[in-house]
């Protein structure tokens, strides 16, 4: 009985963790899309400093996205 409860608790933890990671992935996808749209706006094309800042933000968001995606895939493989 204790073993079953422990297994159920572990499953619930993995589900919560997976849902949290999926939420973070979704937020990062939105952030990446938003930054890319900002970079394409005509009023921003000639503002090189702003574009550079956006480029740095985009690179960081993509890095975080890849890390979260890898974390999610590892979690799926071990479920």
PLM segments and residue spans:
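Charged, heptad-repeat coiled-coil alpha-helices that serve as long linker/dimerization "arms"
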Residues: 1-79
């Amino acid at each position: 009985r204790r073993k079953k409860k422990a297994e159920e608790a572990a499953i619930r933890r993995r589900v919560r963790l997976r849902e949290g990671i999926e939420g973070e992935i979704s937020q990062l996808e939105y952030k990446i899309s938003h930054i890319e749209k900002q970079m394409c706006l005509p009023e921003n094309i000639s503002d090189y400093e702003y574009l550079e800042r956006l480029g740095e933000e985009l690179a960081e968001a993509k890095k975080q996205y890849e890390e979260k995606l890898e974390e999610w895939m590892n979690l799926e493989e071990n479920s």
